[in-house]
Amino acid sequence: MRRKLSAIECMIDGNIVYMVRLEGSFQEDRLRSALARVQRKHPALRMLIRKERDGLYYEEDCAPEVPLRIVPRMAEDDYQRESYVELRKVFAVDQSLLRAVWLHSEFESDLLLVTSHRICDGMSMLTIVREVLRALHSDEELVPYEPISAKIMIGDYQPQHPWKRKLMASLLNGALRLIPGSSSTSENNEYALEWNVSPSLTEALKLKCKTEGVSVHAALVVALDRSLLKIVGKKKLPGWIESPMDARRGRLAALKSDMLFFGGGSLKMRTGQALEEEFWARGRAVNEDIRRMVDQEMLDIPGRYYFNELLRPVSNGRIQTMVRLGDALHVNGSWNRLALSNLGNVIVNDSDAPFRLKDLRLYVHSFNFRLLGLVAYALNGEMRFYYVGDEKCLSRAQANALKQEFMALLQHQVDPLNGDAKAFPLVTAAVAQ
């Protein structure tokens, strides 16, 4: 069975890499078995992408086994080199949409898991990591499920006036066809910053958020908004901070928390609002806005899928023209947006595993649109941040200044007497991507 990629799936062209550092040992045959079992569970990992004259197609249940490349681990930072390679390596048409690299040494290993962003978001990738690590030492059954299709997401939804939706889609399709295609590919000059916050500051921030009745995510939104405004100024401020919403977690009956999925809702918060308001008062307002937006997104998802099915995929040449247009117009951020993703407290390893999870990192690369985003997550009691941006969206100097201002602002909310950039206990590492 096969189906054509939707317009959104065609546009989301990029790779995700997760690196897990494991202290302990396991055998190659056990790793291959773990990858195979996880692949058998998830329909998206058994698909291939075929290129036909009229577009891209998913072909189900025909992918070969997950490729595993084994590399001797000679130095602690070898994963950076391999992650860079894997981020930019296009998935071959005859290979699974998951591949693995094992940087092996006697007592410690780095495992890279790589997938296409078309089938997988950050939370889905954590599911893959969790299941692979579990399967390395457990024979617990992984139960397959049916592919998640647009039809399932739409359900019994019907718009009140279908002709209006069809007319709108027809006009949009016509407008997109007028965009000339570009034969050359824009080079994305992405770079990344990574930093960890000490357990003491992480815990203090969590307690402060709880006391103030504000989610950690709402606090991060306010801090990012105000820091970004200070660094780039009002004229260059992206109009929106956009956060992906996990449509699983019991919110949609068709989706279970352990299913691979990409394409849920997103929460868009306008930047530069209520700047005179005290930080935590603004945080409570944002917190309530997020609650309302989540409820509304859950109602809107079926209709959005219905409309997306009416859209025609945009060719890569036209996407490149759109990217160049954005460059020429000096659009703020990534098409006037900055993405903020919060993966929450990451727990992927079992206490009874014969190895210990020492580290987990993630990396993202886009093959078409320019990236600008910040990912937050907590691991082993430490809050961590991964910033990725294209130089045309934010310069390296601006990104470093944003990091310092962002962290100083968070520190100030926890301890106003020591709220400067040098006061917080921070472990930082910059990685060119």
Could you tell me what each predicted segment is?
Residues A7-M11, Y58-E60, S183:
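Short, flexible, solvent-exposed loop/turn segments with mixed acidic/basic and small polar residues
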Residues M1-S6, I16-M19, F107, I119-L207, ...:
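Non-catalytic, low-complexity flexible loops and terminal extensions
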Residues E23-P43, L113-R130, W195-G233, F385, ...:
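Acyl activation and transfer enzymes in specialized metabolism, enriched
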Residues S105-E108, R134-V143, T211-H217, S227-P238:
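Secondary-structure boundary elements
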Residues M1-R53, A75-L98, K230-Q433:
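Acyl-thioester-dependent acyl-group transfer interface
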Residues R32-R130, R134-H137:
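Acyl-thioester-dependent condensation/acyltransferase catalytic cores
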